[in-house]
Amino acid sequence: MMLSLGSDATVLPFHAKNLKFTPKLSTLNGDLAFSKGLGVGRLNCGSVRLNHKQHVRAVGKSFGADENGDGSEDDVVNATIEKSKKVLALQRELIQQIAERKKLVSSIDSDSIPGLEGNGVSYESSEKSLSRDSNPQKGSSSSGSAVETKRWHCFQQLCRSKETETWAVSSVGINQGFDEIEKKNDAVKASSKLHFNEQIKNKLYERPDTKDISSSIRTSSLKFENFEGANEPSSKEVANEAENFESGGEKPPPLAGTNVMNIILVSAECAPWSKTGGLGDVAGSLPKALARRGHRVMIVAPHYGNYAEAHDIGVRKRYKVAGQDMEVTYFHTYIDGVDIVFIDSPIFRNLESNIYGGNRLDILRRMVLFCKAAVEVPWHVPCGGICYGDGNLVFIANDWHTALLPVYLKAYYRDHGLMNYTRSVLVIHNIAHQGRGPVEDFNTVDLSGNYLDLFKMYDPVGGEHFNIFAAGLKTADRIVTVSHGYAWELKTSEGGWGLHNIINESDWKFRGIVNGVDTKDWNPQFDAYLTSDGYTNYNLKTLQTGKRQCKAALQRELGLPVREDVPIISFIGRLDHQKGVDLIAEAIPWMMSHDVQLVMLGTGRADLEQMLKEFEAQHCDKIRSWVGFSVKMAHRITAGSDILLMPSRFEPCGLNQLYAMSYGTVPVVHGVGGLRDTVQPFNPFDESGVGWTFDRAEANKLMAALWNCLLTYKDYKKSWEGIQERGMSQDLSWDNAAQQYEEVLVAAKYQW
């Protein structure tokens, strides 16, 4: 058997059966070979394993005896011991050579493969080896790192060999030294992988009896024929090892590339702890998508209740609000790669069910304290033992509740030469809510008088007033809204709600980005709410059977007649004027003249809630109204219904239509804001589109769109199924939106 100690290195032959060394040294420049008495294995570079082809058996006489097997047993043993000692002496000498070559690998990350130091490692230095260059020439000088790259690719080649190969003799415990020097710059490794693959010859080696060598050499082993004391690895183990070595033990580069940043998203609500609408969903999902791209991400939200996941980190700070000192406590948890920090204070507590409760001044004081505490989180909260700091940092503020954050960043810090490398981005989710009040409210925000002009606004109806959203839009480094359509509407006098002039002046830093869907929570294939009560999980392949079963289960649960041929029309949302519930109410008599069922889920205005109850009483076999909100029922209605209505008068983005399409439910929407961006109207001529839209918030327009939808459902099943499948096939995840947010953050980072 031959032991290879490196590239083009000295090879030690020894017997394959008795594992006894011969002092003869020879140079090996071949692939895989067997001769009488010699078993030759292949070097795998990483784990230093040996193998041989199936059906090939290395048998022969002991090297301690002659060809005829003459010689005493004692002489053979003594000769073997002496030869083993010589091998160990050679290995000790080579260990010393390793120390001299450490300078050659100083640029290599020592964390690539643990275990280099402290292990008995030896391999022969070679004056002729592969060059570090990605296109090596024959005879060029070599560095240690290039040799290791070669060995790394040898291992890949070995582990991809046929499963029918039988693994040969045990590996020599020489592997730690081969492993460490493999982590390189991505460009070097990629080019080496390209050019070395065809040029490298596998080197061969064997190991002596584990009883006769030091423990530093006795590491992993493989079974060779009837050799006792070794275990043959399964093909699964070999595949796992190959996968680990192919990755080199190093993480893939972040999707963000060199633009990795510290990102802190600040929001007054964050699902699943606090939520009143889409803002909570965005705050709970966008940070996770940004973290998957390689950024260090934190969410900051008020501590409204006792959250089991978060723990008090022992940091106390005091801030002045309207002349009164208030103490805050920071709670922290880490979930899905995101640091989550809750700011606790008595004025936030016990508001879980009504987070925007209280009068105007109560809400204003809460938001002033929240923004003051949030802007200092990167200094005071050691997440994982290390604070975020103010370098390479971007804040993402959301709606008027946190629009004071970019103002405080400017007034308290950047105007005084602090946090110069920190940027702020303000996201508009709903510009109808602006934090307006009398000018006297400026005294509550604790700023000097020279910042008053940022907050002053004038409109023909209310006159001069105090406006927090206006100040945030003026001071933020970048502005984002939640869809392209809504971005266009905000620049108009009708859609900008008095702030359109500021937005038009800031057009250079303004962008629309469509929200995504949290596919972990909203995925019919894994939805936890569809695993009981007759519901079932389904995917694109099982759409028709799965949705049919969910529809029947929903009808049974709500007490409606179980009829497969009747379409279920649904509405899920807030009961108010914005959502167009009054348009649905106006269209209900027309709907009831057709063979349909209507399911509505939501809460809001008392008069609209009462109206739903009255309609259910009048049409108890066709209408079900669920006054209130239930996450479980929202999922089940989305899965079991055929059509979703969204007649919103304005809709910045909208999430329910995205959820519906993900579940194979067809949306019928008013073409405004994000609804226009996300729902492509069905075209029967080229079989394109994922739903129906109508252009004005009028009941007759809603009925016309719904009529076309019902006609397609009943008479054109093939087209209907195509609409469902196209909706489910879309990539609606947050990953696309996160990439676009990243572009905005990078632009803010380099903005001066």
UniProtKB/Swiss-Prot annotation:
Any one of the GO BP annotations: starch biosynthetic process
GO MF term (any one): alpha-1,4-glucan glucosyltransferase (UDP-glucose donor) activity
Residue spans crossing the bilayer: none
InterPro entries referenced in this protein's UniProt entry, alphabetically: GS/SS, Starch_synth_cat_dom
Domain of life of the native organism: Eukaryota
Any Pfam family matching the protein: Glyco_transf_5
GO cellular component: amyloplast; chloroplast
Class of enzymatic activity (EC top level): transferase
Keywords of the record: Amyloplast, Chloroplast, Glycosyltransferase, Plastid, Starch biosynthesis, Transferase, Transit peptide
Spans annotated as Disordered: 116-146, 224-253
Subcellular location: Plastid, Chloroplast; Plastid, Amyloplast
Residues the record lists as binding ADP-alpha-D-glucose: 275
Range of the transit peptide: 1-57
EC number from the UniProt entry: 2.4.1.21
Pathway(s) of this molecule: Glycan biosynthesis; starch biosynthesis
Tissue-specific expression: Widely expressed.
UniProt-listed Gene3D superfamilies: Glycogen Phosphorylase B
Annotated catalysed reactions: [(1->4)-alpha-D-glucosyl](n) + ADP-alpha-D-glucose = [(1->4)-alpha-D-glucosyl](n+1) + ADP + H(+)
Entry similarity comment: Belongs to the glycosyltransferase 1 family. Bacterial/plant glycogen synthase subfamily.
Listed HAMAP family: Glycogen_synth
Name of the molecule in the record: Granule-bound starch synthase 2, chloroplastic/amyloplastic
